[in-house]
């Protein structure tokens, strides 16, 4: 409550009297409604899938690794991605960005026995997305899409988030989603340390951040270096 020790003279007598606090300060506070804390937190009972982002250079075995997933199906934007896989591997080759979203929605809505969905590669899928937005807005540059001022980049992020949301819903049904990407070297400027280079997904920084933040697991493929002679002899 505000202090009541301040005084002021009354108009009639000039005698100092305490200032009364406004009624709003003396009104009783409304009681806080009671609720059960345990109803806010629930344990997961249904089996859930994982969203995995796997990055690496071409021909390093990303697609081969995904063949070990349970009952996988491919959304194949990279047409050469399954060359080393059996012809019986189920796949669909999207022609447009919308085909990718429709395929994920169908996998979400329709009955099937697939337990993993592989997007191979998101690097090519993002190129499809930009082409789709340019055609939709009848522009020749992403900078001009939506009237410019960064709107095109915002539309890209919105569409990526739409696909991520579909994948997360598939995860809730116990279906794994695996996203493959090419990689590139990226220079990181640090305010404290010297600048350094790191391996990054070959896409725009903002969309790469969306994928990395949404993923349960982020993995990068590294070459396996075998040096049996040096290990056995101790010689360089």
Model-derived regions: residue spans:
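Interdomain "pre-motor" coupling segment immediately N-terminal to P-loop NTPase/helicase cores
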Residues: 1-8
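Short beta-rich binding modules
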Residues: 7, 15, 39, 45, ...
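N-terminal pre-Walker A segment at the start of P-loop NTPase domains
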Residues: 9, 14-42
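Catalytic-core regions built around general acid/base machinery
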Residues: 159-173
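Phosphate-binding/switch region of NTP-binding enzymes
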Residues: 177-236
């Amino acid at each position: 409550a505000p202090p009541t020790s301040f005084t002021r003279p009354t108009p009639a007598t000039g005698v100092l009297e305490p200032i009364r606090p406004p009624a709003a300060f003396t009104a009783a506070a409304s009681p806080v409604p009671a609720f059960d804390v345990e109803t806010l937190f629930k344990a997961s009972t249904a089996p859930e899938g994982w969203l995995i982002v796997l990055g690496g250079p071409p021909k390093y075995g990303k697609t081969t690794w995904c063949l070990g997933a349970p009952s996988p199906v491919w959304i194949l934007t990279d047409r050469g991605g399954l060359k080393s896989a059996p012809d019986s591997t189920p796949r669909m080759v999207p022609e447009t960005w919308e085909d990718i979203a429709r395929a994920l929605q169908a996998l979400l809505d329709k009955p099937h026995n697939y337990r993993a969905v592989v997007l191979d590669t998101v690097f090519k899928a993002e190129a499809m997305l930009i082409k789709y937005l340019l055609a939709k807005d009848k522009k020749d540059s992403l900078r001009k899409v939506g009237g410019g001022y960064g709107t095109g980049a915002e539309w890209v992020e919105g569409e990526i988030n739409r696909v991520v949301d579909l994948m997360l819903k598939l995860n809730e049904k116990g279906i794994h989603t695996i996203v493959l990407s090419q990689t590139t070297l990226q220079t990181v400027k640090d305010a404290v340390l010297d600048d350094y280079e790191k391996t990054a997904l070959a896409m725009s920084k903002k969309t790469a951040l969306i994928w990395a933040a949404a993923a349960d697991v982020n993995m990068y493929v590294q070459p396996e270096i075998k040096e049996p002679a040096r290990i056995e002899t101790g010689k360089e």
